């Protein structure tokens, strides 16, 4: 295999969830003989069970294939798989930075989705050659002409000569590979310059330590050299380099333009942050632009149902953290739920995936509190605090202002659902910035508070648009607003895990709706349970869970009324005593009640 740069093609695939990206990748591997028929597990690249089950790609993967083109030359194709979901957009931008081109795979029956548009713009901004591919053209609902027009109007790239393919039946796969060889430029790089390599992804292997997927920009990386990670300034000796075919295949070295893996005995994933630059120790080059540490945006408390699982939960989070630099966690204790962890996530999908993996892979039973976002709190003394837990908000008398994170959302929705979607955005305190009609789709830009989005916005967006609307968002700024802490008291005891930060205008309405919900969820006791909603010291709503009544007079038939009175009096005193010392167990549903904010529930 000649290692000249002109015979290398680095590309990734941009596609919405379920538009057939992983299937196309499998076809490429099959066609280029990367695996035997027996080894072809459906969706080779989605190696996590959860990835296959949800049909999404979470971590970036890569494959190096040798392809014999129609022009008689053999090309080395490096395919870097990217995650498609909005929570993982930083991982996408790093995967794209390692490529010279991208395939834009669009489902011919469904058309363009907001997520695809966002990733496609990232690719175009980074100067990649984008090749459109219409997949699933054999479906009865496929409408290639409409989709071609959508691609040209919404994304603005020429799509009339797009390859028509069906990954399932293998149609158009060879043509797609020919397009890659013909249209995607070869990588530029200097084989003799000092080493410069981009870390596309890192994951932890129990035997090897951290394995990093890298794209070599200049120079070459080989075994036994001493490499340096730019952001941490740490140095390591390289133990092994190689490529994935998709099996791990060691090589002597990787040169400029190539994509492969590096193992250097790094013990934890923070040692090789995604997007960082690797150079040779003592002969450093300037770091590559665009690296930024990952910031969690959504926070939630995870508590084990039985307190003896606390250490197991810590261990499980530590193991997940090895593979997921975006996951943050620190111990937290709650009066209502005992000991647990405050965890930070990239977004809601990320949170669900972590929670599901903890329960599935580590057999833990967990209670999750309502997710919140980070707020900036300016105190009267002029200190600026970052608060990710409503229960740690300072006393209202000490607060000058509370600032909430504002996001810029881009929503793509078919014409007929625009009204419903705009109504939903208004309800979520969104401010419309821009609106464009494109064919039969509308692209709407809104600025809205992130805390309104993390609760149930995605679910409601899907239900108001019958599943057709899609959205992507990015963080804009912190902005001061009139926010208050809404607390809930059960039996006059505040339950810290139920506290939420809400806008003052909707606080009373939210408080009343939630105590009604709690009333239905909290099981009846032998005594009345009072549920109250409060802002500071002011109670804004109250309801009761009625006591169960035990018929103590059932054993008296006929006879003296004073006997019955005595028994009822005794029961009354017992209930009074019980009420003063009785505690109320809150079921998991009570903590989830805070999540859904819509009135119709």
Curated annotation (Swiss-Prot):
Biological source species: Hydrogenovibrio crunogenus (strain DSM 25203 / XCL-2) (Thiomicrospira crunogena)
Major location category of this protein: membrane
Lipid bilayer topology: Peripheral membrane protein
Family: Belongs to the TRAFAC class translation factor GTPase superfamily. Classic translation factor GTPase family. LepA subfamily.
InterPro entries, per the entry: EF-4, EFG_III/V, EFG_V-like, EFTu-like_2, G_TR_CS, LepA_C_sf, LepA_CTD, LepA_IV
Localization, UniProt: Cell inner membrane
Protein name per UniProt: Elongation factor 4
Keywords: Cell inner membrane, Cell membrane, GTP-binding, Hydrolase, Membrane, Nucleotide-binding, Protein biosynthesis
Amino acids binding GTP: 18-23, 135-138
Pfam families reported in the protein's UniProt record: EFG_C, GTP_EFTU, GTP_EFTU_D2, LepA_C
Entry's Gene Ontology BP terms: positive regulation of translation
PANTHER family (UniProt xref): TRANSLATION FACTOR GUF1 HOMOLOG, CHLOROPLASTIC, TRANSLATION FACTOR GUF1-RELATED
PROSITE patterns in the record: G_TR_1 (PS00301), G_TR_2 (PS51722)
Domain tr-type G: 6-188
Name of the top EC class for this enzyme: hydrolase
EC number, as in UniProt: 3.6.5.n1
Reactions catalysed: GTP + H2O = GDP + phosphate + H(+)
Cited function: Required for accurate and efficient protein synthesis under certain stress conditions. May act as a fidelity factor of the translation reaction, by catalyzing a one-codon backward translocation of tRNAs on improperly translocated ribosomes. Back-translocation proceeds from a post-translocation (POST) complex to a pre-translocation (PRE) complex, thus giving elongation factor G a second chance to translocate the tRNAs correctly. Binds to ribosomes in a GTP-dependent manner.
GO molecular function: GTP binding; GTPase activity; guanosine tetraphosphate binding; ribosome binding; translation elongation factor activity
Matching Gene3D superfamilies: 3.30.70.240, Elongation factor 4, C-terminal domain, Elongation Factor G (Translational Gtpase), domain 3, P-loop containing nucleotide triphosphate hydrolases, Translation factors
GO cellular component: plasma membrane
NCBIfam families per the UniProt record, alphabetical: lepA (TIGR01393), small_GTP (TIGR00231)
């Amino acid at each position: 295999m000649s290692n000249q740069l002109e015979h290398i093609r680095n590309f990734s695939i941009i596609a919405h969830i379920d538009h057939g990206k992983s299937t196309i990748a499998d076809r490429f591997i099959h066609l280029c003989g990367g695996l035997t028929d027996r080894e072809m597990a459906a969706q080779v690249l989605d190696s996590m069970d959860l990835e296959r089950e949800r049909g999404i790609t979470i971590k970036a993967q890569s494959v190096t294939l040798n392809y014999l083109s129609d022009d008689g030359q053999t090309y080395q194709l490096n395919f870097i798989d990217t995650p498609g979901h909005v929570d993982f957009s930083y991982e996408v931008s790093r995967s794209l930075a390692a490529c010279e081109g991208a395939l834009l795979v669009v489902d011919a029956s469904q058309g363009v989705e907001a997520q695809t548009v966002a990733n496609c713009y990232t690719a175009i901004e980074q100067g990649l050659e984008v090749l459109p591919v219409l997949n699933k053209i054999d479906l009865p609902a496929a409408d290639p002409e409409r989709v071609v027009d959508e691609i040209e109007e919404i994304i603005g790239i020429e799509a009339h000569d797009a390859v028509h393919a069906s990954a399932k039946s293998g149609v158009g796969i060879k043509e797609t590979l020919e397009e890659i060889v013909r249209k995607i430029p070869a990588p530029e790089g200097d084989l003799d310059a000092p080493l410069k390599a981009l870390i596309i992804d890192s994951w932890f292997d129990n035997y090897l330590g951290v394995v990093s997927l890298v794209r070599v920009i200049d120079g070459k990386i080989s075994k036994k050299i001493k490499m340096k990670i730019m952001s941490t300034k740490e140095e390591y000796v390289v133990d092994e380099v190689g490529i994935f075919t998709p099996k791990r295949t060691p090589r002597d070295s990787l040169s400029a333009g190539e994509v492969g893996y590096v193992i250097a005995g790094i013990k934890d994933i923070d040692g090789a942050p995604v997007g960082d630059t690797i150079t040779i120790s003592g002969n450093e080059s300037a770091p590559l632009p665009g690296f930024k540490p990952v910031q969690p945006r959504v926070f939630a408390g995870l508590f084990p149902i039985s307190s003896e699982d606390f250490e197991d939960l810590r261990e499980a989070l530590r193991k997940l953290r090895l593979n997921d630099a975006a996951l943050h966690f620190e111990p937290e204790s709650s009066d209502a739920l005992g000991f647990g962890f405050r965890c930070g996530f990239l977004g809601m999908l990320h949170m669900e995936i972590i929670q599901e993996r903890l329960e599935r892979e580590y057999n833990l039973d967990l209670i999750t509190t309502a997710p919140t976002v980070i707020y900036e709190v300016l105190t009267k003394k002029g200190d600026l605090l970052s608060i990710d837990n409503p229960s740690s908000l300072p006393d209202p008398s000490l607060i000058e202002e509370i600032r909430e994170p504002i996001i810029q959302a881009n929503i793509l929705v078919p014409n007929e659902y625009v009204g419903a979607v705009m109504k939903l955005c208004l309800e979520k305190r969104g401010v419309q910035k821009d609106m464009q009609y494109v064919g039969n789709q509308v692209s709407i830009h809104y600025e809205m508070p992130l805390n309104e989005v993390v609760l149930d916005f995605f679910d409601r967006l899907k239900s108001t648009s019958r599943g057709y609307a899609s959205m992507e968002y990015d963080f804009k700024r912190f902005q001061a607003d009139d926010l208050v802490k809404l607390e809930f008291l059960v039996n006059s005891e505040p339950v810290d895990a139920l506290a939420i930060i809400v806008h003052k205008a909707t606080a009373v309405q939210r408080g009343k709706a939630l105590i009604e919900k709690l009333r239905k969820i909290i099981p009846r006791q032998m005594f009345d349970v009072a549920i109250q909603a409060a802002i500071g010291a002011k109670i804004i709503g109250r309801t009761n869970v009625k006591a169960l009544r035990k018929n103590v007079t059932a054993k008296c038939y006929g006879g003296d009324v004073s006997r019955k009175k005595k028994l009822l009096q005794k029961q009354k005193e017992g209930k009074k005593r019980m009420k003063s010392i009785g505690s109320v167990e809150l079921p998991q549903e009570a903590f989830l009640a805070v999540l859904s904010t819509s009135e119709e529930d």
